[in-house]
């Protein structure tokens, strides 16, 4: 389950940013996760509940923005919503495509509490 290591990385980012801001805790954190990022949301949620205990994220609201995947055909340039990493272009039927959006996993923002 690589989701646990992802959550541990998010905790580290939150702790570093909280220290920089001279804050005590995080009120909310917003993540951006692409539909083709490879992250299993149920596993992320399970890992999240365990990993945030005793950290600055323990009482934080978790907001997740899902990003739909978009592919661009290398043959005809057509852009389309992708449901898998290897999907044919609906315009020319080529399988030579690039995923241009939807593989990301980012910490977009966090709000901190200075007591």
Model-found features: residue ranges?
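Solvent-exposed beta-strand sheet faces enriched in polar/charged residues
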Residues: 29-32, 63-65, 108
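Long, charged N-terminal interaction/targeting segments
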Residues: 1-58
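Short, flexible, mixed-charge glycine/proline-rich loop motifs
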Residues: 61-68, 78-83
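C-terminal binding/interaction regions
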Residues: 111
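Compositionally biased, charge-rich low-complexity tracts
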Residues: 114-115
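Short functional micro-motifs and their immediate structural scaffolds
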Residues: 81, 94-98
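Short cysteine-rich clusters marking metal-coordination/redox-active sites
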Residues: 73-76, 89-92
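Cys/His-enriched microdomains
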Residues: 71, 87, 105
